[in-house]
Amino acid sequence: MSLFDFFKNKGSAATATDRLKLILAKERTLNLPYMEEMRKEIIAVIQKYTKSSDIHFKTLDGNQSVETIEVEIILPK
């Protein structure tokens, strides 16, 4: 993959694939009853120490036994 390929528009098939991955990731988290509570606790701790309200969670692709969640925090200046 070259640098120029990074800026090309994705085709509809690639976009549909990405959307399906998001749906499947969300369905996997629905099976874990503690996941939403854990997210709320993480947000509370982050807000306590950073005073940031701009926090985003993203579920990353993992294998079937491990789920990875990425947290993006936008810190105020």
UniProtKB/Swiss-Prot annotation:
The keyword Cell cycle applies. Pfam families: MinE. Keywords: Cell cycle, Cell division. Disulfide bonds: none annotated. The keyword Cell division applies. Prevents the cell division inhibition by proteins MinC and MinD at internal division sites while permitting inhibition at polar sites. This ensures cell division at the proper site by restricting the formation of a division septum at the midpoint of the long axis of the cell. Belongs to the MinE family. This is Cell division topological specificity factor. It comes from Helicobacter pylori (strain J99 / ATCC 700824) (Campylobacter pylori J99).
